[in-house]
Amino acid sequence: MMSHKKQDAFQGLIDALKVLPNVGPKSAQRIAYHLLQHKRKEAEKLVDALQTALKQVYHCAMCNTFCEGGLCDICADETRDGRRLMVVHMPADVSNMEAANCHDGLYFVLMGQINTALGMDVSAIALDRLAQRLGGGEVEEIIIATAFTAEGNATAYVLSEFFKNLPYKVSRLSQGIPLGGELEYVDAGTLAQAVYERRLIKEGGA
């Protein structure tokens, strides 16, 4: 039987694991047992990798994704079309768009979405950083690439209102993406079609 002190350490591991997406108390307990019983060396590597990432990975100064250095590789690429800016929910969405090879412009990563049930309001989607990003004047079209979920639709609505009186053409991905579908799980072909057939929300101009 574990001593009280050791039990506290084990419970601390479980509590730490529960911060991961879709990991509840039972799943966290199973992962903790597995790491301690079978994967101690791998767990040490995980700790080292996490500590290194926390020290070296920051937000890109332009698009707000994660990167090592001031700018991510995409923002630093001068061959990208800076006139089109795709606004996405999270860094994984950028990776999926790049894999689909359907957007040669730049990105802005919101790092969140509106979810009133969880108390996540407009402050969750980095509108202030997005406004700063648009200050350069090169952008002509904003492509809203949020998912067709309740949260994604709410976020898209707030974004469209934000851009309403600004001089940008605004469009959103077509609904070829399944209703309720996150971009992370959409295949490359469907994703590309949704970009090419994107729906116009407003024309550019003041």
From Swiss-Prot:
InterPro entries: DNA_Rcmb_RecR, Rcmb_RecR, Rcmb_RecR_Znf, TOPRIM_dom, TOPRIM_RecR. Residues 83-178 form the Toprim domain. The keyword Zinc-finger applies. It comes from the Bacteria. One of its GO terms (molecular function) is zinc ion binding. GO terms for biological process: double-strand break repair; recombinational repair. A zinc finger (C4-type) spans 60-75. Keywords: DNA damage, DNA recombination, DNA repair, Metal-binding, Zinc, Zinc-finger. The keyword Membrane does not apply. It holds the Pfam family Toprim_4. Gene3D superfamilies: 3.40.1360.10, RecR Domain 1. SUPFAM superfamilies: Recombination protein RecR. NCBIfam families: recR (TIGR00615). May play a role in DNA repair. It seems to be involved in an RecBC-independent recombinational process of DNA repair. It may act with RecF and RecO. PANTHER family: RECOMBINATION PROTEIN RECR. Belongs to the RecR family. This is Recombination protein RecR. It comes from Neisseria meningitidis serogroup B (strain ATCC BAA-335 / MC58). The lineage of its organism: Bacteria, Pseudomonadati, Pseudomonadota, Betaproteobacteria, Neisseriales. The gene is recR.
